[in-house]
Amino acid sequence: MNRIKRLANQKKYSRLFFDDAFYIGFFMFLVVPMGMSLYYSFCDYDILSPPVFTGLDNFKHMFSDGTFFKTLKVTFFFAFVSVPLKLLFALFVAMLLLKNSKLSGFYRAAYYLPSIIGGSVAVSVLWKRMFSSNGVINSLLQAIGIDCTVSWLGNTNTAIWILILLVVWQFGSSMLIFLSALKQIPASLYEAAMVDGSGSVYRFFKITLPLLTPTIFF
């Protein structure tokens, strides 16, 4: 009886230990920084000197600045285009890799690699060289007879699309999440739908997509 109580207490303390570790990390690395950011938004603060409370002056300056709404518009456009494209591409590749093959492990690693190195300085320099006025992209266009000397990252009309492409290129982490979620869908659902004569499009929209909704909005 005492042994059972000791085991129960050990499980209880272990659970409390892991729960406390999560809550401490959540509080220290999320709640505290968010609270500090909110407080500093009402202050005049330059890191080197103590913050001076200024009330709503920062917000008044922000809304009176003509570039604020333009920046907000570009940010929303970037998010509304890049996020759906990244999710769609990740889901498409995950469904292709769902079929087991000898090279599936290699493909998963290859597709995941950009997610690891995508934020590095080397990749930033590489993309800058690729899309500069005398970069690789313009050289390839000139090789097929298209005279192009535009600086893709220096042009306001094209720079946003290059940045979106850079985000979509790092779809590997989302692809692995989708791949794991797809494997959790019972095969019996697809088999029953096929017996009823349902096509692949119907199965995707009536089975796959609804069951992936929690993952998509995660």
What are the residue ranges of the model-derived segments?
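A structural signal for multi-pass alpha-helical bundles of membrane permease subunits
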Residues: 8-218
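Membrane-interfacial, low-structure loops and terminal tails that flank and connect transmembrane helices
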Residues: 2-3
